[in-house]
């Protein structure tokens, strides 16, 4: 079964809100987000030396434990290990209020005129903690070493800028159908925990981090929608006909999530393939996009090695906060 379909079914089976991360911390452990990160940044000592680890945890761990690890579905982040017995750092980008909220609207309500109103509650948030949850982050790989406290401060000054330009958590890369042309054209990029991690690798490399010797590039999840209709079209939400079409689409998608309770995996898969061959809608950065998915290969979910930075470093490309009050 396609991994995304399996995840959607899992979301439908569970009736409670699902957090994308495990947020239970002991006393003395503090969390900082992009709007108050300076409080944490100013506690880091310039002379400290850090190692950077790429860490992963099974997706929806708080609800399913290690189950989704079996299909290589992970939440990812970065751990900065302090070699001078100073504070360790964990930083990740996650979906709030839940992973489910990235796929389904908060509410779809029909008014007295028979028209729908759709409400979303989904965002992407960077969180920094002075703690490493060894139980939760059960996979790790050394990526860089010899990062100074000064470089870590500079990195933490970059993170709020990233979050302000990536306020929505978006699961999908949207690309042209490979069967139509020899090369794929990317129309929309995803904005996920993995995307944040790889952006962090790039920034920390430019700041002077030394790449560790690894046998292969680290692996990451990647979900792609392949479309045959050309560039996705922004839908006019104020057009009641279009809005009702969007509402019907997401109601159907939610119904598919609930099918896992009384249908076989093969039945669900076949129905979803038929569904995906029609028009598809995505909610990205506060806009609705309409597209026609490829009949041959509408969607892919991969877990493959992805390159880490090499070559020339350009420190001046990094946008960051100039100072912290």
From Swiss-Prot:
Keywords: Glycoprotein, Signal. GO terms for biological process: lysosome organization. It holds the Pfam family CLN5. Residues 1-19 form the signal peptide. One of its GO terms (molecular function) is hydrolase activity, acting on glycosyl bonds. Glycans are attached at residues 88, 117, 133, 163, 182, 189, 238, 262. GO terms for cellular component: lysosomal membrane. InterPro entries: CLN5. Belongs to the CLN5 family. PANTHER family: CEROID-LIPOFUSCINOSIS, NEURONAL 5, CLN5-LIKE PROTEIN 1-RELATED. This is Cln5-like protein 2. The lineage of its organism: Eukaryota, Amoebozoa, Evosea, Eumycetozoa, Dictyostelia. The gene is cln5lb.
């Amino acid at each position: 079964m396609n991994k995304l379909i399996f995840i959607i079914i899992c979301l439908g089976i569970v009736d409670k809100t699902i957090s994308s991360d495990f947020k239970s911390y002991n006393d003395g452990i503090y969390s900082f987000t992009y709007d108050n990160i300076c409080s944490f940044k100013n506690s880091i000592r310039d002379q400290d030396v850090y190692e950077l680890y790429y860490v992963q945890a099974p997706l929806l761990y708080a609800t399913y434990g290690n189950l989704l690890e079996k299909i290589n579905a992970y939440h990812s982040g970065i751990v900065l290990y302090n070699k001078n017995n100073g504070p360790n750092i964990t930083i990740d980008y996650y979906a709030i209020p839940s992973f489910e909220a990235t796929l389904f609207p908060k509410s779809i309500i029909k008014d007295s005129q028979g028209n729908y109103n759709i409400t979303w509650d989904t965002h992407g948030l960077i969180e920094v903690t002075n703690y490493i949850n060894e139980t939760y982050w059960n996979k790790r790989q050394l990526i860089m070493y010899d990062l100074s406290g000064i470089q870590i401060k500079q990195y933490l000054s970059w993170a709020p800028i990233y979050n302000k330009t990536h306020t929505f958590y978006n699961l999908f890369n949207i690309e042209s159908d490979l069967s139509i042309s020899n090369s794929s054209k990317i129309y929309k990029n995803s904005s996920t925990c993995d995307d944040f991690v790889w952006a962090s690798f790039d920034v920390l490399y430019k700041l002077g981090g030394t790449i560790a010797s690894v046998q292969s590039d680290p692996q990451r999840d990647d979900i792609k929608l392949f479309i045959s209709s050309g560039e996705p079209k922004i839908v006019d939400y104020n057009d009641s006909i279009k809005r009702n079409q969007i509402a019907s689409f997401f109601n159907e998608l939610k119904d598919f999530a609930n099918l896992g309770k009384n249908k076989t995996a093969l039945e669900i898969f076949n129905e979803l393939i038929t569904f995906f061959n029609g028009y598809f809608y995505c909610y990205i950065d506060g806009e609705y996009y309409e597209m026609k998915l490829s009949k041959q290969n509408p969607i892919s979910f991969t877990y493959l090695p992805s390159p880490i930075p090499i070559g020339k470093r350009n420190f001046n490309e990094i946008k960051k906060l100039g100072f912290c009050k």
